[in-house]
Amino acid sequence: MMRLSRMIVVILLSLSFAPLASAKITAQQVAIVINMKDADSRLIADYYQKKRGIPQQNIIKISMPVGESSIGEKKFTEIYQQVLEQTPGSVQYYALAWSKPFKVACMSITSAFTFGFDRAFCAKGCKPTRMSSYYNSDSELPSDELLIRPSMMLAGSTLQQVYGMIDRGVAADGLHPQATAYLMNTSDKARNVRSRRYPVIKELLSEQINIEQVDADVLQDKDDVMFYFTGLKKVRSIESNRYLPGAIADHLTSSGGNLFGRKQMSLLRWLDAGATASYGTVVEPCAFTQKFPNPGIVIERYTNGESLIEAYWKSVAWPGQGLFVGEPMASPYAVQY
């Protein structure tokens, strides 16, 4: 089958073949980072370790201030060095077991743990940032091959919400559900910039999953949601839908990654509604599509068997300002052994 993501990279002019479905990432490849000063962080880490069988040597303990949305570059650099010193060589990915902080100066905390703090991944105003070496990569061992460890937060509006998100991720493995990807063409011109890709996504990936392009601001009462991509400040009626285990949903807007902000809808609302992962920016990104997930890449890679953290991370070209939250090991389309 023609590979959509390659076509996008070269302005839809080249073709390639999608890879065979892959096996899910393993517990030995994931490390959980715990903030020992945060009681909820300790509980989340313990719950996730048990649910996913993460080895004890992959439990990394740090100390950070509790309750702050952001930490500074200097403090983060100290913490990051401690994390690197505790990380076994087999680890390819980090699961960050807390909801705050979610920002490091001008970077998201997931990007800071992935790349190390680097102002090349930041931007003041409407400017590009450094491209991720992981973007649309076929790497299965990012630490070994690219010297990065993609990171995802185990975060939520409440402790019980985080537990539920983890449970949905575990339940997703090998499910191969009858599902739909919903691509919303909204009335918000500034935030609807991804919609130009929708026709070719639908044309090329409909054999892998049912895809519906919906010309509306609201999707409601659907019972088969695996993907929901839209562009709005606030998305109504999301709780009316049934999100299948492993579902990915996000809304392209400026501050969705401000987890507890009120100016715009937080990405946590998707998780409250039943999604297993979402994405949002922590710093004003402007409407660069490169700073948000490319729906075609996510859909293609996820339905071809990659884990959630792989497919989602690989879909963002400029992720420095973007926050990934979800259950990283969820693999609804992976081959099970």
Predicted feature locations:
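Cleavable N-terminal signal peptides
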Residues: 10-11, 21
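N-terminal signal peptide c-region/cleavage motif recognized by signal peptidases
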Residues: 16-18
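Bacterial N-terminal signal peptides that target proteins for export
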Residues: 1-9
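Cysteine-dependent hydrolase recognition
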Residues: 24-337
